[in-house]
A protein has these predicted regions:
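Core nucleic-acid recognition elements
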Residues: 1
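Extended non-globular scaffold/tether segments
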Residues: 255-266, 271
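Extended, non-transmembrane alpha-helical coiled-coils
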Residues: 266, 270-273, 277, 293-296
Length: 844
């Protein structure tokens, strides 16, 4: 078979290529011979008849096993042991080489796990669903002193650790003390940084989890293979070694790249051997053929360029698993899947492969990556639940503005619709030229309760990235690298999720002379109590001072953490998969990426906007309540319920197409971005601002006292830029108009807008057309992102009471989806309380 490279032409899919909703009729007429097609259609109908949503029976069996594995997520200490032994044996050697040897040894010793229903080889660890441990970051995070393992075993998403694994982690912890990222950070950061984190003014711990929120440069691997990259690194090393004054750091970098690439190749070869062994003993002829195909692919990729769709996907999986062994951070993403996969799919379709066979492979990849789970310590259940956020991006436009839809775009949507899994996330880029059939397929997927895709507006994000310094070509090549933050394949390294600022806490300090309302500790500058301000502008100035205090201290904290990474934690494998690193002889963490910027996210936009509006409207404009009275009420967490209801119901609220409240929300966003942009990080890189929160809107909300919008102390904050729950009362159109008043181009790191509709609202073609038009109108008005829950609150309450009946119920938590029954009770309640749209217009 002719070998394909990324120079192959990506054929744009014409409209109405796909015939009917039944995926057995998913045919590309110009590629299919009539007799073969009819035979395959009958075969597809037979093997899909027993599955609820159209997935192949084999993939559906694998999905069923996933839910069993989900109850036994485990800790795998293999990597921790390998990394420790390598570091102990290589004292004094360059850090990059030590990291590379540790990763290579891990990939050489992880047990090979292949499920009986797997169509692809590879896994993050040697167990069905388990997490690596990364002692070089913060080893005590995993010991009995730091984690109540008995509690973790009984949480909604239980985590299992064997006595042997726990004993090993405990035994290696002393070696790492004083040598880790966490230790170095503690030496560099300010004395009060821990207190400001603990009081929920900000959350600056993200990079303790390693380097992530990046795009694995799959197109580069498919074009050249790891052997091609190794050859380039070898040539560069030889050139450096023969220079008049060889640079030892560059030589060490090249050595670390070669070691890392060889480690991934050996990892694939081990799977080829195991697949061959299993094939030889397989009793079922069909399974034997599958295993032989897997073995053949593992012998070729990712060392060499793939020959077909199957090998391209297998190569991508091995690269992702290799990167998981190098760095623990979530959101190592495959980028624009429909772009890099299209040449292989087009080739296979042209040579007689039925479209259903391609969709079956995509289903299998979705299921494989759903097993990528990362233990993030004690807070996992309330911060991110271990979701790895290996986001797929599809759709979008080219640099010339033309549509980038390929034959793969709708195939991916249909595969997600078939599998109905919460992970991996799926983002659809849309623009003015997005074909109707793509909109229709995406809306149908949403209407079925998948929670995916999320929708992202090219016109806004391309402009925002160009403002950040991206070329037009690179900006048009953006992809989601997690919840909603953006990167460009092979050219950018964030860290785009460096941490979070709690805007609601800033307001609390502004109203309380810089003191925490809960602990009474003095945290921020003294800006006076609410009753001491004689004008609304004085209140706003106090808020601005507290915001500036928070961002300045946060900047120092995360810059110290960046410095710790630069000194101790190179990423040679990830560096090898970029455009510049091998050419420059410099690791990504040392600044070799074409674009480098750090993302700071704000949390609590709606609470701050509505609280400031309430103060202005009820205290200073109408004088319906005195500043002293309001101050006393929020300090005491609203003993007067009647006053709290006045604040909730009489003051204008963001989300209702009301000028005063919406203008305040726009100001809160603009002021946050201005403050973020006034700082630079350790690398003197520009910050980009975002409005999203993973699940930290709940976590950071615990540390915020009562607010003037009527929110009680320690309640959750609102994620992203959506209006506060229950405050958008005039229907979805008014809500969308309010959100569109914000200048979304300011959020170069993305913003999240969650909406909830009942299933009846999207039932039938007419309602789905209304829904699609609503989305398009929002994007024409300048909105950036939309994502949806399509579920009734009554169903959620039933699922909370009887989780055993609803194991597959998917909900949007923040920028990611999750299985509702696996979330904590607090998260479940927050989702239930969100505004649910039951009508297209009017109060409800």
């Amino acid at each position: 078979m002719t070998q394909l490279t990324q120079e192959a032409k990506v054929v744009t899919t014409p409209q109405a290529v796909f015939i009917g909703e039944d995926t057995s009729n998913f045919l590309r007429a110009e590629h299919a011979e009539a007799g073969t097609s009819r035979a395959y259609e009958e075969h597809a109908r037979q093997r899909r008849r027993a599955t609820p949503f159209g997935a192949s029976e084999q993939n559906w069996r694998r999905r069923d096993k996933f839910f069993e594995y989900l109850r036994t997520c485990a800790i795998d200490s293999t990597r921790a042991r390998c990394m420790t032994e390598v570091f102990q044996a290589t004292e004094g050697q360059p850090q990059a080489i030590r990291i590379a040897r540790g990763v290579a040894r891990t990939l050489a010793e992880i047990p090979v796990f292949i499920d009986d229903d797997d169509l692809f080889a590879g896994n993050v660890t040697g167990r069905p669903m388990a997490s690596h441990i990364y002692p070089e970051l913060m080893p005590d995070y995993y010991t009995s002193e730091a984690v109540d393992w008995d509690a973790v075993r009984t949480q909604p998403s239980p985590v299992i650790i064997t006595p042997e694994d726990l004993a090993l982690l405990t035994s290696i912890a002393p070696y790492w003390r004083g040598k880790t990222i966490g230790d170095r950070w503690n030496e560099l950061r300010r004395a009060d940084d821990e207190a400001l984190n603990r009081h929920c003014l900000y959350f600056s711990y993200n990079m303790l989890a390693g380097i992530g929120h990046v795009i694995a440069n799959i197109p580069l691997v498919l074009q050249r293979g790891l052997a091609g990259l190794r050859e380039e690194a070898t040539r560069a090393r030889k050139k450096e070694a023969t220079a008049r004054k060889p640079d030892p750091d560059r030589l060490a970098f090249y050595d670390s790249v070669i070691i890392s690439l060889d480690g991934v190749v050996r990892y694939a070869q081990r799977h080829a051997e195991e697949c061959g062994r299993l094939a030889a003993s397989a009793g079922d002829p069909t399974r034997r053929l599958q295993l032989e195909r897997m073995a053949e692919a593992c012998r070729r990729v990712p060392e060499h360029p793939p020959c077909d769709t199957f090998e391209a996907l297998q190569s991508a999986l091995f690269v992702l698993y290799g990167l998981a062994a190098e760095s623990s951070q979530i959101s190592i993403c495959p980028g624009r899947v429909d772009q890099w996969l299209a040449p292989f799919v087009e080739h296979d379709l042209a040579t007689g492969t039925p479209p259903e066979a391609i969709i079956e492979l995509l289903e299998a990849v979705i299921c494989k990556l759903a097993h990528w789970w990362t233990f993030t310590g004690r807070e996992a259940a309330i911060i991110d639940t271990g979701n790895n956020l290996c986001t797929f991006t599809i759709g979008g436009s080219h640099a010339d503005g033309s549509d980038a839809t390929t034959v793969v775009t709708e195939m991916v949507l249909r595969a997600y619709n078939h599998m109905r899994m919460a992970h991996p996330p799926l983002a659809l880029r849309v623009h003015k030229g997005t074909p109707d059939h793509v909109w229709e397929a995406a809306v149908r997927c949403i209407s079925n309760g998948c929670g995916m895709p999320s929708f992202m507006n090219d016109e806004v994000m391309v402009s925002a990235l160009q403002d950040l310094g991206f070329s037009a070509e690179d900006a048009h090549n953006y992809a989601d690298v997690g919840c909603v933050e953006m990167g460009s394949t092979g050219t950018s390294l964030g860290p785009v999720s460096i941490g979070f600022i709690n805007l609601a806490k800033c307001l609390e300090l502004a109203l309380n002379d810089g003191r925490c309302a809960l602990s009474k500790d003095q945290l921020g500058p003294r800006t006076g109590r609410l009753a001491e301000h004689e004008s609304f502008e004085s209140v706003r100035r106090a808020y601005e001072r507290q915001l500036a205090f928070a961002v300045e201290n946060f900047n120092h904290s995360v810059s110290a953490l960046e410095q710790a990474h630069a000194e101790l934690r190179p990423v040679p494998l990830l560096s090898a998969l970029t455009d510049n690193a091998i050419r420059e002889g410099r690791d990504l963490i040392r600044g070799s990426s074409k674009y480098r910027y750090a993302g700071i996210e704000g949390i609590g936009f709606a609470e701050v906007a509505d609280s400031l509006t309430a103060i202005k409207h009820l205290v200073f404009d109408e004088q319906a309540v005195t500043a002293e009275e309001l101050y006393d009420q929020i300090q005491a967490d609203f003993p007067d319920e009647r006053l709290r209801q006045r604040l909730i119901n009489r003051a204008p609220k963001y989300g209702n197409d009301e000028d005063t409240a919406d203008a305040m929300a726009a100001w809160v966003c603009e002021r946050f971005v201005q403050e973020v942009k006034s700082h630079r990080d350790y690398w003197n890189s520009e910050y980009s601002a975002g409005a999203w929160s993973i699940a930290l809107a709940m976590t950071l909300g615990f540390g915020v006292g009562a607010l003037p919008n009527g929110r009680r102390a320690s309640q959750t904050l609102t994620e992203g830029i959506r209006p506060a729950s229950g405050c958008d009362r005039n229907g979805p159109t008014s809500c969308l108009k309010s959100v569109a008043r914000i200048d979304h181009r300011l959020f170069q790191n993305g913003s999240i807008f969650n909406m909830t509709f009942t299933p009846e609202m999207l039932d039938g073609d007419a309602n789905r057309r209304k829904f699609s038009q609503l989305l398009r109108t929002f994007f024409v008005m300048g909105g950036f992102q939309l994502q949806f829950n399509v579920v009734d609150a009554a169903v959620l309450r039933e699922a909370k009471a009887h989780p055993e009946r609803h194991r597959g119920l998917i909900v949007r938590v923040a920028g990611y989806c999750a299985y509702f029954v696996n979330e904590t009770s607090h998260v479940q309640d927050q989702i239930i309380e969100r505004t649910c749209n039951r009508a297209w217009t009017g109060t409800y």
